[in-house]
Amino acid sequence: MNITIISVGKIKEKYLSDAINEYSKRISRYSKLDIIEVADEKTPESPSDVEKSKILEKEAERILKHLKKDSFVITLEILGKEVTSESLAKKINDLSISGKSDITFIIGGSLGLSKNISEISDFKLSFSKMTFPHQLMRVILLEQIYRSFRIINGEPYHK
């Protein structure tokens, strides 16, 4: 299994970097993991709809450069489907069993993801109806991927 996380924006806070490194190390027991950061666009304080659209398209271009053709794409979106940890584990396991060895998770920037990226998504995932900082979402996603592998392998995990 190969898992790629494409995320818009750089992690600046050490505590988030530490958590990302820890979960990356834990996941490496189960899967190859690549984390790709693409640059985010500077967003004005009160961007117009046109400015938002241009920003999202520029970020989408950067994301698409790193997307593998045969990868199963899971986008993190507010309007995506909310699932349990067990359901996410089942999804990952089912993909592996069906021969999909590459999964790419995409995390947008502060404005989310462009329509173009959303349209190529094989599965739209939401962690909550609440909004989280995209940097923190990377940690939350990694924890859930790690938890998924623990569940798949019948190993204990915190409930």
Swiss-Prot record:
Q: Name one GO cellular component term.
A: cytoplasm
Q: Which CDD domains does this chain map to?
A: RlmH-like
Enzyme class comes to transferase
Which transformation does this protein catalyse, written as a reaction? pseudouridine(1915) in 23S rRNA + S-adenosyl-L-methionine = N(3)-methylpseudouridine(1915) in 23S rRNA + S-adenosyl-L-homocysteine + H(+)
Q: Which Gene3D superfamilies match?
A: 3.40.1280.10
Recorded GO molecular functions are: rRNA (pseudouridine-N3-)-methyltransferase activity
Answer yes or no on keyword Methyltransferase: yes
Report residues binding S-adenosyl-L-methionine.
Answer: 76, 108, 127-132
EC code(s) of this entry: 2.1.1.177
Record keywords, A-Z: Cytoplasm, Methyltransferase, rRNA processing, S-adenosyl-L-methionine, Transferase
Subcellular localization = Cytoplasm
Cross-referenced NCBIfam families? PRK00103.1-3 (NF000985), tRNA_RlmH_YbeA (TIGR00246)
Give the UniProt family note: Belongs to the RNA methyltransferase RlmH family.
Function per UniProt? Specifically methylates the pseudouridine at position 1915 (m3Psi1915) in 23S rRNA.
User: What's the protein name?
Assistant: Putative ribosomal RNA large subunit methyltransferase H
